[in-house]
Amino acid sequence: KVIAKAVIMAIGVTPEVELAKQAGLEIGVTGGIKVNHHYQTSAPHVYAVGDAIEVTHFITQKPTRLTLAGPAQRQARAAADHMYGRTYRNTGVIGSSVIQCFNMNAASTGLNEKDCQKEGIAYQTAYVIPKDKVGLMPNARPLFFKLIFADPSGQLLGAQAMGEGNVDKRIDIIASLIMKHGNLEDLKELELSYSPLFGTAKDVVNMAALVGLNVLNGEYKQVPVTEIRELQESDAFIIDAREAWEFEEGHIKGAVNIPFSEFRNRLDEIPKDEPVYVHCLSSQRSYNMVKALNMRGFDNAYNLMGSFLGLSMYEYFTDKTEGREPIVTNYRFDLL
C-alpha cells in the first residue's frame, strides 16, 4: 500500500510504430509515420491516420505529433475521400484540448509561451481573470484566461483557460479564429451570445483582445506573473491597490498598501525615480491605477499581470511541493 492524499493515474497509450518500421514505411523526424497531404505513407496504396502519424502544425508549418480523437477521425474521413478521388483541404492541426480535474476545467489551443520561444516567434500575452458570468448571478466563478498573440501583427497564436465554468467555449472561439488567421481586432469585434446566466456582456475573450490591443499600442506597461517573485526578492517598490481589509487577509511581503480609492490623496508616497509595480486582486483596479498614474506623470508605473489572484495560483503549488518560502503572507483563489 502507498499512503497518499491523492493518486493521479496517467495511463494514456503510447502510439506504436514498430510494425510500420518493420514494413519499411518511412518514419518522420518526430518518430511518427511520415504521410503526405492525403495521409499516404511511403508505401504504395498504404494510408495511415491517427496517433501514430506525423502531422503538420497549422501555425508553425512544422511536423508534430498529436494524440487526439477529433483530428484522427477527420484524418480517416480525408483518407477515405482521397481513395474515392474526392478533394480534401488539409489545414494541419493546432492541438485544441480540454480536461476536467475535480471541480476545475482546463483547456488550451495553439501555441503556448514555451512553443513561441522555441520557434523564435515574437509574441505578447494578455492575462485576464474576470468572472465567467455576471457577478450577481449564482455560481459566478473566476475564469483564468491567457491569450497569446504575435507582436506586432496581433495574429492569434494560442490560448489557455482554467476555471469551474465553460472554459471549452472560450478556447473553441480562439481555435476557430486561429484557423481563419484571425487577429486581436477580429476577436475584439466578435459578437457572441449573451445572457447574465451564461456570460458577461463583454466576454472574457473580448476582454483579452482589448487588453492585448492596449499592450500592442503601448497604452501601458506590464510585468508577467512569472517575474513577481524576482521583484519581491529584490525589494522592488510594489503597490497593493486593494482595500486595507483585503490587504490584511493576504499580501505580497514588503508590498505597500495604497488602495485605489485613496491613491489620489497619497501620490507623495509613490516614487518617480524607480519602477513602481501595481497590483490588486485580478488586475482591474491596478490597471486603472496605472493609467491614472501615467496621466499624472508617473511613467515608471507597471501593472502586474494576474495580480494577487494570478500570483497565488502561480506560486502555491511550488511553494507547497518544494517547501519554498512563500512571498505572500497568505494565498487567495477567488474573486470578491
Predicted feature locations:
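FAD-site-proximal beta/loop scaffold in flavoenzymes
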Residues: 1-78, 173, 177
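Redox-cofactor binding/interface segments in oxidoreductases and associated redox assembly factors
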Residues: 9, 28, 48, 239-240, ...
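Short, structured coil segments at secondary-structure junctions
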Residues: 23, 42, 119, 251-253, ...
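Generic secondary-structure signature for well-ordered alpha-helical cores
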Residues: 25, 81-88, 121, 179-183, ...
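Mid-to-C-terminal Rossmann-like scaffold of FAD/NAD(P)H-dependent oxidoreductases
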Residues: 52-164, 200, 204-230
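A short, polar/charged loop-to-alpha-helix boundary motif
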Residues: 165-183
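Rhodanese-like catalytic fold shared by cysteine-dependent sulfurtransferases
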Residues: 185-226, 231-237, 244-277, 281-336
